[in-house]
Amino acid sequence: MRLGISSYCLCPNLRDGKMTIFDVIRWAADHDCQHIEFVPFYLDFLANPELIDRVREACSEANLPISTYSLNADLLKPDLEERRAEIQRVKTHIDVAHRLGLTKMRHDVASFRRPMSSNTPQNFMKEFPLMVEGVRELADYAASYGMTTTLENHGFFVNGSDRVISLLEAVDRKNVRMTIDVGNFLCVDERGENAVKKCLPYADMIHLKDFYIRDKVRLAGVGGLFDCDNGSWFETVGGSMLRGAILGQGDLNIWKILGDVKHAGYDGDISIEFEGMEPCEAATETCLRTARTIWEQV
């Protein structure tokens, strides 16, 4: 197992101009990360293609492998022309991942695009053929580079373990795997302690995070649909409220989850993905320390 961070952990500092992406790379290396994952937030590779090479070279100089590149996407746009444009956009990011020297990349299927009222089993089944078609096309494109694509339980619509597994089975491509986010199952009111174990046979990457879980009535005037920014309360499909926490300090049983991961023999990459309200550098450092301690003891 290799433990590292997603650049998402330090996005508040990137946003506020306190760090550059090269500072993030150095921070990860200085904190003994064994890999780094990139997300294209405050990191516009498409507008600045030479940045791809600079980032790859900086990671090489820091002896910090790049594990993956993770992208929000919506392959279910209602208009055919828009769907084709979105698939082409994801393909350009697969090109980026290849230029970074990667063998895998995560893309979403339907990130944060549907109100709760349309997030139904009926609509999921109705749109299922489009999902399969889009994921297959992107997987086949990635295969031309020898790359694997991964789907994450993310974005509310393709979020529960059964939905993700059903899609993976229907796509039926050897180079399509899963990024398991241990916390995101809570967005659809599924406990990660149960869902992670079910999804482990499909895993090619794990995002490690924690959440506080509260009843909505206790949090008047906060949160909203898809208001998932660092430190914000946001609503689940079932009406509970979540907020990002420092690993091990929230309401997920991280000990059980990491124990299940370790005892299943998972030997891939794990990324810390901190999205709480605490200062991001100190919080991410605590998350790394906590993950290492738990992994050693479970």
Regions picked out by a protein language model, each given a short descriptive name:
Residues 26, 57-61, 65, 77-178, ...:
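Active-site acidic/histidine proton-transfer and metal-coordination neighborhood
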Residues 20-41, 101:
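Catalytic domains of carbohydrate-active enzymes, especially glycoside hydrolases
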Residues 5, 28, 36, 59, ...:
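Conserved, mostly hydrophobic/aromatic
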Residues 281-298:
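C-terminal helical cap(s) of enzyme catalytic domains, especially alpha/beta-barrels
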Residues 1-20:
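Boundary/entry segment of secreted carbohydrate-active catalytic domains
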Residues 15-28, 84-95, 188-197, 254-257:
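Short, acidic/polar
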Residues 35-36, 66-69, 132-251, 292:
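Acidic/histidine-rich catalytic cores of soluble enzymes
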Residues 12-18, 39-51, 74-84, 113-117, ...:
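Acidic-and-aromatic substrate-binding clefts and catalytic sites of carbohydrate-active enzymes
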